[in-house]
Swiss-Prot record:
Its EC number is 5.3.1.12. Keywords: Isomerase. The gene is uxaC. It comes from Shigella boydii serotype 18 (strain CDC 3083-94 / BS512). It is an enzyme of class 5 (isomerase). Transmembrane segments: none annotated. GO terms for molecular function: glucuronate isomerase activity. Belongs to the metallo-dependent hydrolases superfamily. Uronate isomerase family. This is Uronate isomerase. GO terms for biological process: D-galacturonate catabolic process; D-glucuronate catabolic process. Pathway: Carbohydrate metabolism; pentose and glucuronate interconversion.
Length: 470
């Protein structure tokens, strides 16, 4: 019997252990996509307690707690921090088999140093007190934890209308060497069907000093904000394409679509597709000219529980996987961007693992001469951000493309404790390659495979995003 979560956790061959301990373990973290609040990094936020850093805003945990029958007041409601933590501690023993069980105990190990102790109602007091004592120390502030975890770069997720004042404040602080850069997330500018679209156009017009009436005006406003983001070091964009659409339109049609929507009219699905296509093609060309990377997160079915959405809003754990086809529309969108050689470096993520091979083969259609891995099949996202999901994504990437050129893991998280997800990923990567060696499917060449592991853990992302590190 193998003990739970030792230093060799998941490393079930000698070759895997060598790969992890000698090549993967000490690689820095390049966290190119996350949802950390830049204000907390700028202020070097001190966390009030373990709830504040661990449960607040974590829809993964809330979802598990609801499944365990926990009342909503103990998830997102008015219960005290300690009551909410106790409800989580009572849920954790029921999460065996869920990635939350592994994540929880990896996060207690690093950075808190708690080993050999499982979170449950019987250990809740001890763990609560021990972690809270550590959180009062300087090296457990927001920046302190990032430094402990050997982070070199984080890319936050930011709206085109954001001031980026906190990124500017961080950049001016020469004592803090971790790069904290904005990522451009323009969803509200192309989701023309949303009720909030008109208000957003007014805000975008205000911050860009542009009167947005025609499609060319929208392009002008977005270009000004792209310049603003570039001035703050942005090299990355991200888009939630819950449904991939493609339909072409001429400028007169786009002007009409925008004008009628701004006048309060409801558009047809075809008109929505025309508008979104035009915005994404325009933005893709801008990214290509600037040397940016674009990310497409595809296939979420959001806000399924309308009653809870009305009470609590979005992003609180009521989303799931869509099964709408997307291969043809995605192919047309990428091909359109590529027509004039203005398809930027692109990372594609799918929420439905059924689509792994769709993306794994799609990226091979649009690779770039002289640019290894220009098109990327992104790491297992959201519901696939677990052992089986990561293994499937990497296996299918290896079978259909070049695993050695993969840009690796990202946290996609709102928590400063999520950096152990990079450790989890690295252990799974080394386990997988170690098993290939054990089965005679890959050579037992530690230099060849060790260098490949180092590249996937850090070097590939550093080179791909072309961000100069401190």
């Amino acid at each position: 019997m193998t003990p739970f979560m030792t230093e060799d956790f998941l490393l079930d061959t000698e070759f895997a252990r060598r790969l992890y301990h000698d090549y993967a373990k000490d690689q820095p973290i390049f966290d190119y996509h996350c949802h950390l609040p830049p204000q907390q990094i700028a202020e070097d936020y001190r966390f009030k307690n373990l709830y504040d850093i661990w449960l607040k805003g974590d829809h993964y945990k809330w979802r598990a707690m609801r499944t365990n029958g926990v009342a909503e007041r103990l998830c997102t409601g008015d219960a005290s921090d300690r009551e909410k933590f106790d409800a989580w501690a009572a849920t954790v023993p029921h999460t065996i088999g869920n990635p939350l069980y592994h994540w929880t105990h990896l996060e207690l190990r690093r950075p808190f140093g708690i080993t050999g102790k499982l979170l449950s109602p019987s250990t809740a007091d001890e763990i609560w007190n021990e972690c809270n004592e550590l959180l009062a120390q300087d090296n457990f502030s927001a920046r302190g934890i990032m430094q402990q975890m050997n982070v070199k770069m984080v890319g936050t997720t930011d709206d085109p209308i954001d001031s980026l004042e906190h990124h500017a404040e961080i950049a001016k602080d020469g004592s803090f060497t971790i790069k904290v850069l904005p990522s451009w997330r323009p969803d509200k500018a192309f989701n023309i069907e949303q009720a909030t679209f008109n208000d957003y156009m007014a805000k975008l017009g205000e911050v860009s000093d542009t009167d947005i009436r025609r499609f060319a005006d929208l392009q002008t406003g977005l270009t000004k904000r792209l310049d603003h983001f570039a001035a703050h070091g942005c090299k990355v964009s991200d888009h939630a394409l819950d449904v991939v659409m493609f339909a072409e339109a001429n400028e007169a049609e786009l002007d009409s679509i925008l004008a009628r929507r701004l006048a309060g009219e409801t558009l047809s699905e075809h008109e929505v597709a025309q508008f979104k296509t035009a915005v994404l093609v325009f933005l893709g060309a801008e990214y290509a000219r600037r040397g940016w990377v674009q990310q497409y997160h595809i296939g979420a079915l959001r806000n399924n529980n309308l009653r809870q959405f009305k009470l609590l809003g979005p992003d609180v754990g009521f989303d799931s996987i869509n099964d709408r086809p997307m291969a043809e529309e995605l192919s047309k969108l990428l091909s359109k961007q590529n027509e004039e050689n203005l398809l930027p470096k692109t990372i594609l993520y799918c929420l439905n693992p059924r689509d792994n091979e769709v993306l794994g083969t799609m990226i091979g259609n649009f690779q770039g001469e002289g640019m290894p891995g220009k098109m990327q099949f992104g790491s297992g996202w959201w519901f696939n951000d677990q052992k089986d999901g990561m293994e499937r994504q990497m296996t299918q990437l290896a079978q259909l493309g070049l695993l050695s050129r993969f840009v690796g893991m990202l946290t996609d998280s709102r928590s400063f404790l999520s950096y152990t997800r990079h450790e989890y990923f690295r252990r799974i990567l080394c386990q997988m390659i170690g098993r290939w060696v054990e089965a005679g499917e890959a050579p037992a060449d530690i230099n060849l495979l060790g260098e490949m592991v180092k590249n996937i853990c850090f070097n590939n992302a550093r080179d791909y995003f072309a961000i100069e590190l401190n």
